[in-house]
C-alpha cells in the first residue's frame, strides 16, 4: 500500500507483523487465556484503550518506507521509540528532488510579496544550490562535504519500523492542527494505513485515546 504525499513524497507500507488480535492475545496471556468470540475480543481492545493498558499494542509492528523533505524527517525522527534507516548523502549522489510549496500553501499568511513569488524564489534558490552541489562533486569535493549546500526542502527517504503503541503517539502529536501542515499530511497517510490493518484498534484509539483534532474532522 503506497500513498502519495505533497508534490513528490510518499508513505509505503513495507511490512506488518500482527493485527488487532495480536493485542488481544498479548493481553490475555496474563490470565493464560487466548481469543474468545469477535464481540468479546473487540470489547477487550476498547477496554485496554479506555483504561490506558497500552503494552499489548506493542506486539503489532509496522515497517514503512517514507519519502519526505528533510525538515519533515527531522521532526519525524524526534519520535524515538522506533527504528530508522535513512538514505545517506555520504555514500549516494543526491537527486534533484525538492519540495516546492504551492502558492495555496501560503493562503492566510500576511506576506509582503505574492505567494507565487515566494514559490519562484524557493525554486531559484533550489536550482542554484543544486548546481553548486554538482559543481563541487565534479571538482572532487567529497559528497559528505558537497551536500552541506543543499536546503532542508531536499527529499530524503527512510525506513521506519514502529509498534502500534508508538505509532498512536505519533498520531497524537502529528495528526493535530498544532503540527506543521506538511507532517500532518504524512500523519494522515499513516492513520489511513493503520485503520486498514487494525480497524478495531484504530476505532478504539479515536474514541478513547486520541488527543489531537484533525483525525476527527477528516475521513481517513
Curated annotation (Swiss-Prot):
GO terms for biological process: dTMP biosynthetic process; dTTP biosynthetic process; methylation. Binds 4 FAD per tetramer. Each FAD binding site is formed by three monomers. Its EC number is 2.1.1.148. FAD binds at residues 55, 78-80, 86, 163-165, 169. The active site is at residue 174. It is an enzyme of class 2 (transferase). A motif (ThyX motif) lies at residues 78-88. Keywords: FAD, Flavoprotein, Methyltransferase, NADP, Nucleotide biosynthesis, Transferase. InterPro entries: Thymidylate_synthase_ThyX, Thymidylate_synthase_ThyX_sf. SUPFAM superfamilies: Thymidylate synthase-complementing protein Thy1. Pathway: Pyrimidine metabolism; dTTP biosynthesis. Its cofactor is FAD. It catalyses: dUMP + (6R)-5,10-methylene-5,6,7,8-tetrahydrofolate + NADPH + H(+) = dTMP + (6S)-5,6,7,8-tetrahydrofolate + NADP(+). GO terms for molecular function: flavin adenine dinucleotide binding; NADPH binding; thymidylate synthase (FAD) activity; thymidylate synthase activity. This is Flavin-dependent thymidylate synthase. The lineage of its organism: Bacteria, Thermotogati, Thermotogota, Thermotogae, Thermotogales.
Amino acid at each position: 500500500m503506497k500513498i502519495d504525499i505533497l508534490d513528490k513524497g510518499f508513505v509505503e507500507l513495507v511490512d506488518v507483523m500482527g493485527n488487532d488480535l495480536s493485542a488481544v492475545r498479548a493481553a490475555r496471556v496474563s490470565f493464560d487465556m487466548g481469543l474468545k468470540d469477535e464481540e468479546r475480543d473487540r470489547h477487550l481492545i476498547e477496554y485496554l484503550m479506555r483504561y490506558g493498558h497500552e503494552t499489548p499494542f506493542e506486539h503489532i509492528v509496522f515497517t514503512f518506507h517514507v519519502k519526505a523533505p528533510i525538515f519533515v524527517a527531522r521532526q519525524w525522527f524526534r519520535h524515538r521509540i522506533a527504528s530508522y534507516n535513512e538514505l545517506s548523502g555520504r555514500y549516494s549522489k543526491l537527486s534533484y528532488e525538492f519540495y516546492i510549496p504551492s502558492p495555496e500553501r501560503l493562503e492566510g499568511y500576511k506576506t509582503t510579496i505574492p505567494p507565487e513569488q515566494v514559490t519562484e524564489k524557493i525554486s531559484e534558490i533550489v536550482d542554484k544550490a543544486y548546481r553548486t552541489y554538482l559543481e563541487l562533486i565534479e571538482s572532487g569535493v567529497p559528497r559528505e562535504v558537497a551536500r552541506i549546500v543543499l536546503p532542508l526542502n531536499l527529499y530524503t527517504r527512510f525506513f521506519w519500523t514502529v509498534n502500534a503503541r508508538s505509532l498512536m503517539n505519533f498520531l497524537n502529536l502529528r495528526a493535530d492542527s498544532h503540527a506543521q501542515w506538511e507532517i500532518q499530511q504524512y500523519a494522515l497517510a499513516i492513520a489511513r494505513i493503520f485503520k486498514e490493518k487494525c480497524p478495531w484498534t484504530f476505532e478504539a484509539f479515536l474514541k478513547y485515546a486520541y488527543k489531537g483534532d484533525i483525525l476527527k474532522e477528516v475521513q481517513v
